[in-house]
Amino acid sequence: MHGNYPTLKEIVLELDPPDPVGLHCNEQLDSSEDEVDELATQATQDVTQPYQIVTTCGTCNRNVRLVVQCTGTDICQLHTLLLGSLEILCPVCAPKN
């Protein structure tokens, strides 16, 4: 720009189209990396370990203690059941029901 205010004569537009860029990535992951991740995930889910559970009796509200051995996935499912309609009964209330 040579003057104080831009004019249409001073604006230069380049009408050449931009160079096309390939949007496809040529990188590939080794399948072994994926398999290692999958195996690590499965290994952590398949390992069983003991879990102590303390809940209340569904009838008298006394504390009930359980120990279960299961996987992490299974303990999450048990947790969901205990939060729902599943009730554990204490040894005193169990024969009555």
Swiss-Prot record:
One of its GO terms (molecular function) is protein domain specific binding. It comes from the Viruses. Pfam families: E7. Residues 1-41 are annotated as: E7 terminal domain. A motif (LXCXE motif) lies at residues 23-27. A zinc finger (unnamed) spans 57-93. It is found in: Host cytoplasm; Host nucleus. Keywords: Activator, DNA-binding, Early protein, G1/S host cell cycle checkpoint dysregulation by virus, Host cytoplasm, Host nucleus, Host-virus interaction, Inhibition of host innate immune response by virus, Inhibition of host interferon signaling pathway by virus, Interferon antiviral system evasion, Metal-binding, Modulation of host cell cycle by virus, Oncogene, Transcription, Transcription regulation, Viral immunoevasion, Zinc, Zinc-finger. One of its GO terms (cellular component) is host cell nucleus. One of its GO terms (biological process) is DNA-templated transcription. Highly phosphorylated. InterPro entries: Papilloma_E7. Signal peptide: none annotated. A motif (Nuclear export signal) lies at residues 75-83. The E7 terminal domain is an intrinsically disordered domain, whose flexibility and conformational transitions confer target adaptability to the oncoprotein. It allows adaptation to a variety of protein targets and exposes the PEST degradation sequence that regulates its turnover in the cell. Homodimer. Homooligomer. Interacts with host RB1; this interaction induces dissociation of RB1-E2F1 complex thereby disrupting RB1 activity. Interacts with host EP300; this interaction represses EP300 transcriptional activity. Interacts with protein E2; this interaction inhibits E7 oncogenic activity. Interacts with host TMEM173/STING; this interaction impairs the ability of TMEM173/STING to sense cytosolic DNA and promote the production of type I interferon (IFN-alpha and IFN-beta). Belongs to the papillomaviridae E7 protein family. Plays a role in viral genome replication by driving entry of quiescent cells into the cell cycle. Stimulation of progression from G1 to S phase allows the virus to efficiently use the cellular DNA replicating machinery to achieve viral genome replication. E7 protein has both transforming and trans-activating activities. Induces the disassembly of the E2F1 transcription factor from RB1, with subsequent transcriptional activation of E2F1-regulated S-phase genes. Interferes with host histone deacetylation mediated by HDAC1 and HDAC2, leading to transcription activation. This is Protein E7. It comes from Human papillomavirus type 55. The gene is E7.
